[in-house]
Amino acid sequence: MASEKSFKKRKITDDVDGVGVGGGLESLPEDIIADIFSRLPISSIARLMFVCRSWRSVLTQHGRLSSSSSSPTKPCLLLHCDSPIRNGLHFLDLSEEEKRIKTKKFTLRFASSMPEFDVVGSCNGLLCLSDSLYNDSLYLYNPFTTNSLELPECSNKYHDQELVFGFGFHEMTKEYKVLKIVYFRGSSSNNNGIYRGRGRIQYKQSEVQILTLSSKTTDQSLSWRSLGKAPYKFVKRSSEALVNGRLHFVTRPRRHVPDRKFVSFDLEDEEFKEIPKPDCGGLNRTNHRLVNLKGCLCAVVYGNYGKLDIWVMKTYGVKESWGKEYSIGTYLPKGLKQNLDRPMWIWKNAENGKVVRVLCLLENGEILLEYKSRVLVAYDPKLGKFKDLLFHGLPNWFHTVVHAGTLSWFDTPLDLW
């Protein structure tokens, strides 16, 4: 296990006068204790963990809810606010009643060393964050316990690089892995390995790097490994779809190879493999995203004016199991109308997926959407109706991350709420 000096953990106070404050809880039947904890939001559970050692023991022994899914039925939402000079991280707990939901802000202990960051991914309640200023720092972070770990730097560094990340957990190996795909121009100062196409720099060289974390991780074993050259050129964004222990990416079309591909990276055997695509028009013509909805791999295909279709792969890896489950029409939230001088300009980049993001399916069957990084909207597929979600304290500009609350760390069992 990595040493205590390697990462920061919150301290737990001792019981006052040696008397167990949690004695009252311990005397209750286990089913009652489990029922009590299941009704509490993760933010409340996190606070109780640090009241005293007795309460922490009770929560650890009786409050555990095992889950193998990275998409919880009652997720909380993390809102990454890209404010000038210093970024912020807020959260909304969707397990509370809608009228009582308030946006809360996390205190980031690493803010001085990494004031601006991107969220690489969320898995089992742990976040992987990357330095958006210098691209040389990565952190593992649990926002509810404030545990954090700065990951080591890669031995191989390149100038003028483009990065694609992935972060996930494999249920069989019980290992977390951080995937880093580097596209670069080469070590020389000339133009070898680089060319311009359609006004954009294209990098011809690449390297795939990976780092593993588990209960067996030590300071000596915590290091990056090279997997060689990347077999594909992916769209520059982190993987948002972790399904079946695999990260999923979309390839970038090339001049002579316009066909986009779906590619998975298996966190167990560390191999890239192509995934069959649905038989629908527009996949090669427009941009699209892969997301995880209720444990299924889904493809969001964008059309004009914010319209989109959601295709679901019901049986993983089987092409014939793809089916179009949802079609969502054009909608302009009131919040966007009030903040835009010319509201119709919003649809300019709609086909590139820069207007609407599909986040998750809610318990009531509604689809949670994010519009232009400013407004959250719930869409009812049965009624075909949209509802703007207005929460107190919502930042003016944010990137939403669907998150499963946990009190665990990378070297401990999962405790998901």
From Swiss-Prot:
Q: Which InterPro entries match?
A: F-box-assoc_interact_dom (IPR017451), F-box-like_dom_sf (IPR036047), F-box_dom (IPR001810), KIB1-4_b-propeller (IPR005174), SCF_F-box_component (IPR050796)
Which Gene Ontology terms of cellular component type are present? plasmodesma
Span of domain F-box: 22-68
NCBIfam families in the record, alphabetically? F_box_assoc_1 (TIGR01640)
Any matching Pfam family: F-box
- State the name under which the record lists this protein: F-box protein At3g07870
GO biological process terms, alphabetically, are: positive regulation of cell population proliferation
What SMART domains does the annotation carry? FBOX
PROSITE patterns named in the record: FBOX
